C-alpha cells in the first residue's frame, strides 16, 4: 500500500523537519513493514513551469515548431512537435539534466542542450506521458503537450511545487497489515504515528444525520450476518465533472487512477479511512435497495455487457427489479455513473470478511474494496466515512441536497474486553512496566484501561475488536510494541536439550530425493496440492472419491490432489516444448477421503494425507524397451541406495492410465506399494503430450520401510585383473532376466564374481518365439591371473547351468 506523507500530515501534526528514516524505522519496528520511502519530487528535478511567448515554424522541419519559452528570468528557444501548442500556454519544461522518457517509452534519458535539425534547443517541452504523469493527465493524442495554464504558477516555478509533487511516498508491505484492517487507510496509519510520538490527532468534521427523508428511499438488509451494517444516502444536484486537482493528485500518488468527481470521492474516502463506498446512479435504481443472497439462476450484467452467472453464496446489492452489484466486490452496468447522472445513492456498508473473500476468489476479481473488506472492517467506521463523504460532496457540489439517509445496523459490534494480570504481563515481557506507563501508551492507541489490584481491565477500541485483539497475548504484544521491542534487554536462557530423535521416515525421504536427483539425474518439481479437472479425467479417468475445495483457485482446479500423476503429466506437457528427453520427480502428500482421525484431536475427521513419490521419464526416442529398463532400474535400485526393504515387481492389477503391455505393480513383500508403467497412448493424447513416450512410477512412500541399521563390509582392491566375459544365449521369449541373474548368483565358484545384463534382441536372425540374451560375467582370482582355459571353464559352467534350467543354447 502506498501512503502519502503529506496526506498523513492532515491528521497528525508531524514536525516539518521530521526524520523520515527514523519514522520509517519506528513504523517498521512497531506496526507495519515500510519497504521503501520514495521522494516523489526528486523524479522532477530540473523541471519547471514554462510560458510560451512566441511560436515560429522550424525552418527545416514541417512538423516542428521553435518556441521562445520563458523558464523564469530568461527566455530560451525550445524545439517541439506538440500538436496543441499555443502562445501564452503554460507547459512543463525539462531543462538540461532532467530525466524523461521519449514518448513515454524505453528507459529514462538525460535531457541535454542540443541542436534539432539545425536549430538550438534548450531542453524539452513535455507531454504528460514523458514525465510519468499519464494517469494524472490522460490524453488520447500521442503528440499532446501537458497544458498547465490552469495552474497558478509563474514561469520558473519548479514543476514539483506547481503540481504538489513534493511528497514522500511510503511503500508498506500489505502482508504486514493482513490482521490490521484499521491500517488500510491514511487515517489509521496517522493514528499509529500519533501514538508512537504522542502527537495530537485531527478529527473529521461531523455530519448531521437529522435528514428528512423526502425521497422515500429506504434499504432492507435480509442477511444481517453477511451485512452487519448498511448506510445509504441519496444526494441530488450533482453532476459528472473532473474532481479538483488536489483530490486527483492524492488519488494518483497512492496508486489509483482519478476518473470523475463522483467516483473520485468514493476512492478518496476509501484511501483516507480504509472504508470502501460505492455511488449508484439513483435514476437507475428501481424501488429501494435490498441486501440479499443471489437466487439460483440470477445473473449480473457487467459494464462490457456480459452476463455473469451468480452463486447462491454471493451477497448482492439488488433493487426491486434485480441484481445491481456484487456486495463489496464490483458493481454492474445498471448502477454505473453516466455523463447524465444528477442524483446518486451513496452506499457505505460493512460486509462479512469470509463471504467477500469467497466471492472475490470465485470470480477472480480482487478489487481495492474487496481487499479491505476481506480484513474484517469495523462497522463503526461507516460513520467516519460518511462524515468525510458529506464534507467532500458539499465542497465539490455547493448546491447538493441530501434527500434521504438510511442506516440499517442490525448487528452492532461488541467491543472486546480483556482482563490481564500485571504479574502475568511482567513474566511474559521479562520486565516490569509501571501501570501509569502502560495506561498512557495504551490510551494513545484508543484502549480503555482501568486497574484493580494486580488486574488490568482493557476495553478494546472498535477498530481493533473485529478479531485482531481478543486474548491476553494480544494485549501483551500491544504493550511491548509501544514500549519498543528494542528497549527490552536480551537475557540468555539456560536450558538443556534432549538428543535429536531419529526420524526414519524423514531420513528415508531425504535419501530418496538425493538418490533420484543426484545419482539418477532427475529434476525435482513442486506442484500445487490441487489438480486440473482435464488431467484428472485423462489420467485417473474418474473423479469419484476425490475431495474438492470449497473455494478453489479456479473452477477447473477444484479437486484436491489424490495422486501425483496428473500434475506430473501436466509438467511433462510444459517441458515437452523445450527438451527431447528429461526425467522429473516429486515427493508430496496426497489426500484421500478415508475417514482419517487426527492423532492430535480424535474429534477431528480429516482426509488421509500419505506421502507419495512419483517420477516421469519422457523421451522422443521410440525405443520403449530401453525406456522401460531405465525406469525399472531406477525404481529397483532405489532400495539399495536409500537403504530400505527390497522392492519386487509383479503383474497383478493394471493401472487405468497404463499401456496394455508395458506395466508392473511394485511390491514390498506381499504388499502392493505402487505402479510402474508406460503411459497409454490415449492418455498421453488426452493430456496433450504430442510426441513423447512417458514411463511413470508412483510409490506410497509411507509404506516403504527404512532399515534401522546396516553393516558395511569392505574388501581390498583386486591385485590381479578381472575379466569381463560376454555370453549371448538363445532362450525362450518368456524367460526373464531376473530369473537368469538369480541362477548365475546361485553358482558356487570363487572365480565368478557376478553377472550383468547387456542386451536383449528379437529379430530376423533369431528364431520365432526365441530371444537373444547377452550377459556379461565378471571372472577373476584374488591369487593369480587366470589363463584363457580357466576363464573358458568358468563360462562353460555358467552356460551349462543356464542351459539346464532354461533350455538355453549359445548363440553363434
For every predicted segment, state its role.
Residues 1-207, 345, 362-364, 368, ...:
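Phosphate-backbone binding interfaces of nucleic-acid-interacting proteins
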Residues 2, 22, 427, 444-447, ...:
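A carboxyl-terminal module marker
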Residues 4, 11, 25, 65, ...:
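Glycine/proline-enriched, intrinsically flexible loops and inter-domain linkers
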Residues 4-10, 167-176, 228-236, 368-375, ...:
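Short, hydrophobic beta-strand segments
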Residues 48-79, 266-334:
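Conserved mixed alpha/beta core segments that line enzyme active sites in large multi-domain catalysts
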Residues 129, 240, 308, 312-414:
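Conserved catalytic alpha/beta cores of large enzymes that bind or transform nucleotide phosphates
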Residues 195-222, 397-425, 432, 475:
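Terminal amphipathic helices with adjacent charged low-complexity linkers/tails
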Residues 418-582, 778-782, 790-812:
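Extended, well-folded interaction surfaces typified by the phenylalanyl-tRNA synthetase beta subunit core
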Amino acid at each position: 500500500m502506498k501512503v502519502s506523507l503529506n496526506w498523513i500530515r492532515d491528521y497528525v501534526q508531524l514536525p516539518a523537519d521530521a526524520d523520515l528514516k527514523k519514522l520509517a524505522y519506528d513504523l517498521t519496528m512497531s506496526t507495519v513493514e515500510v519497504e521503501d520511502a520514495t521522494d516523489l519530487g526528486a523524479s522532477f528535478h530540473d523541471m519547471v513551469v514554462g510560458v510560451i511567448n512566441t511560436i515560429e515554424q522550424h525552418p527545416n522541419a514541417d512538423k516542428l515548431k521553435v518556441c521562445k519559452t520563458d523558464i523564469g528570468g530568461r527566455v530560451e528557444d525550445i524545439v517541439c512537435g506538440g500538436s496543441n501548442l499555443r502562445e501564452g500556454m503554460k507547459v512543463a519544461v525539462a531543462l538540461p539534466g532532467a530525466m524523461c522518457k521519449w514518448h513515454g517509452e524505453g528507459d529514462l534519458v538525460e535531457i541535454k542542450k542540443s541542436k534539432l535539425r539545425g536549430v538550438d534547443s534548450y531542453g524539452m517541452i513535455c507531454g504528460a506521458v514523458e514525465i510519468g504523469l499519464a494517469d494524472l493527465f490522460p490524453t488520447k493524442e500521442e503528440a499532446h503537450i501537458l497544458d498547465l495554464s490552469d495552474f497558478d504558477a509563474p514561469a520558473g516555478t519548479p514543476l514539483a511545487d506547481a503540481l504538489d509533487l513534493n511528497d514522500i511516498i511510503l511503500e508498506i508491505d500489505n502482508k504486514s497489515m493482513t490482521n490490521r484492517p484499521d491500517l488500510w487507510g491514511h487515517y489509521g496509519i496517522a493514528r499509529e504515528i500519533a501514538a508512537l510520538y504522542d502527537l495530537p490527532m485531527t478529527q473529521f468534521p461531523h455530519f448531521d444525520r437529522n435528514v428528512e427523508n423526502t425521497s422515500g428511499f429506504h434499504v432492507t438488509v435480509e442477511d444481517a450476518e453477511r451485512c452487519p451494517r448498511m448506510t445509504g444516502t441519496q444526494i441530488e444536484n450533482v453532476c459528472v465533472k473532473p474532481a479538483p486537482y488536489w483530490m486527483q493528485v492524492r488519488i494518483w500518488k497512492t496508486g489509483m487512477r482519478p476518473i470523475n468527481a463522483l467516483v473520485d470521492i468514493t476512492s478518496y474516502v476509501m484511501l483516507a479511512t480504509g472504508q470502501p463506498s460505492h455511488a449508484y446512479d439513483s435514476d437507475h435504481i428501481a424501488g429501494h435497495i435490498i441486501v440479499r443472497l443471489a437466487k439460483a439462476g440470477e445473473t449480473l450484467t457487467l459494464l462490457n455487457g456480459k452476463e455473469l452467472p451468480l452463486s447462491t453464496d454471493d451477497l448482492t446489492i439488488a433493487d426491486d427489479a434485480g441484481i445491481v452489484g456484487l456486495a463489496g466486490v464490483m458493481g454492474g452496468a445498471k448502477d454505473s455513473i453516466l455523463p447524465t447522472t444528477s442524483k446518486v445513492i451513496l452506499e457505505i456498508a460493512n460486509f462479512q470478511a469470509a463471504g467477500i473473500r469467497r466471492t472475490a476468489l470465485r470470480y477472480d476479481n480482487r478489487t481495492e474494496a474487496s481487499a479491505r473488506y476481506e480484513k474484517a472492517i469495523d462497522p463503526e467506521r461507516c460513520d467516519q466515512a460518511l462524515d468525510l463523504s458529506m464534507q467532500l460532496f458539499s465542497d465539490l457540489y455547493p448546491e447538493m441536497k441530501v434527500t434521504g439517509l438510511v442506516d440499517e445496523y442490525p448487528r452492532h459490534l461488541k467491543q472486546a474486553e480483556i482482563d490481564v494480570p500485571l504479574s502475568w504481563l511482567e513474566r511474559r515481557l521479562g520486565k516490569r512496566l509501571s501501570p501509569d506507563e502502560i495506561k498512557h501508551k495504551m490510551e494513545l492507541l484508543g484502549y480503555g484501561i482501568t486497574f484493580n489490584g494486580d488486574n488490568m481491565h482493557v476495553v478494546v477500541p472498535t477498530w481493533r475488536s473485529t478479531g485482531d485483539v481478543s486474548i491476553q497475548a494480544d494485549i501483551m504484544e500491544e504493550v511491548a510494541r509501544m514500549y519498543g521491542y528494542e528497549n527490552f534487554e536480551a537475557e540468555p536462557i539456560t536450558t538443556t536439550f534432549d538428543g535429536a530423535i531419529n526420524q526414519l521416515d524423514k531420513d528415508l525421504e531425504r535419501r530418496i530425493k538425493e538418490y533420484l536427483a543426484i545419482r539418477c539425474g532427475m529434476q525435482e518439481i513442486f506442484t500445487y496440492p490441487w489438480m486440473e479437472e482435464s488431467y484428472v479425467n485423462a489420467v485417473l479417468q474418474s473423479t469419484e472419491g476425490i475431495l474438492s475445495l470449497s473455494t478453489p483457485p479456479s473452477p477447473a482446479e477444484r479437486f484436491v490432489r489424490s495422486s501425483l500423476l496428473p500434475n506430473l503429466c501436466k509438467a511433462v506437457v510444459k517441458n515437452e516444448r523445450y527438451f527431447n528427453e528429461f526425467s522429473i520427480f516429486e515427493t508430496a502428500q496426497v489426500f484421500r477421503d478415508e475417514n482419517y482421525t487426527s492423532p492430535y484431536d480424535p474429534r477431528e475427521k480429516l482426509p488421509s494425507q500419505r506421502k507419495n513419490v512419483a517420477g516421469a521419464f519422457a523421451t522422443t526416442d521410440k525405443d520403449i524397451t530401453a525406456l522401460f529398463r531405465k525406469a525399472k532400474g531406477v525404481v529397483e535400485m532405489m532400495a539399495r541406495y536409500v537403504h530400505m526393504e527390497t522392492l519386487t515387481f509383479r503383474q497383478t492389477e493394471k493401472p487405468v492410465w497404463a499401456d496394455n503391455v508395458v506395466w508392473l505393480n511394485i511390491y514390498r513383500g506381499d504388499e502392493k506399494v505402487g505402479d510402474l508403467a508406460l503411459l497409454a497412448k490415449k492418455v498421453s493424447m488426452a493430456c496433450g503430450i504430442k510426441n513423447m513416450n512417458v514411463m511413470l512410477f508412483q510409490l506410497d512412500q509411507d509404506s516403504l520401510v527404512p532399515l534401522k541399521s546396516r553393516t558395511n563390509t569392505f574388501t581390498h582392491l583386486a591385485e590381479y585383473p578381472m575379466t569381463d566375459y560376454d555370453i549371448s544365449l538363445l532362450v525362450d521369449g518368456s524367460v526373464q532376466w531376473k530369473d537368469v541373474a538369480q541362477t548365475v548368483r546361485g553358482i558356487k565358484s570363487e572365480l565368478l564374481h557376478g553377472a550383468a545384463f547387456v542386451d536383449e534382441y528379437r529379430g530376423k536372425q533369431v528364431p520365432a518365439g526365441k530371444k537373444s540374451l547377452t550377459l556379461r560375467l565378471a571372472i577373476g582370482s584374488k591369487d593369480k591371473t587366470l589363463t584363457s582355459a580357466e576363464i573358458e571353464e568358468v563360462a562353460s559352467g555358467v552356460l551349462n547351468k543356464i542351459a539346464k534350467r532354461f533350455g538355453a543354447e549359445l548363440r553363434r
